[in-house]
Amino acid sequence: MSTAIASARLQALNAGSAASTHLAECLAVDFAALLQAVAPTLPPAAIQRMRAAAGKGITQRMALAAALLREAGQGDVQHWQAHSSDTVRGWACYLIGADAQATLADKLQAMRPLADDPHFGVREWAWLALRSDIVAGPLEALALLQPWAQQPSLHLRRFACEALRPRGVWATHIALFKQQPEHVLPLLETLADDPERYVQDSVGNWLNDAGKNQPDWVRTVCKKWQSTRDSVANAYIRKRALRSL
């Protein structure tokens, strides 16, 4: 299937008047053009810095956009998190994540509506923007996120698991959970029969991550679950967890 994006569609994405519908569109956004469109009073030097960063990875450019907005006195999270562009709402995530005065608990509270955003991309930026804090204090993050695993919102339940993945996608690894994944077992147990496939995928991926360093532990957990849990959801999670192990 072709991933070519029509010119008019790309213009709308770069103007901030449309949200992306798939990953290829997310990656195709011209950050300098979007920044200039949504924050027209930014100094030209700021736009040039973003233009010069065009070849960098997308997570680096997300963080840079937030930094440029903050430096220009335009770092109002509430303003940006209400924007129609999912990329701009992602910048709001990075504004929260880069707040040096906020504790992790404060950041998680501020991030909550973005972690529950209707757009798939914003929900990913929400945990990626906090990843450095989580890596720096994984047990604190685990304690703070345990209650999220019991929330009515499937997005928040998934966030609780995805944010703590030992490896993750586009993310710094969490060394403690790679070597001692048992710390997270109570949270995984909470989600072990989750009815939503979106959450099941995250739990299965979490265990598969852990299995790259601790395969015997993952096999033991799955064997126990096989004998104590008979849900279709858990069977799916176990299959996903054990793939490639």
Where on the chain are the PLM-derived regions?
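Surface-facing alpha-helical segments and adjacent helix-coil boundary elements at the starts of domains
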Residues: 1-245
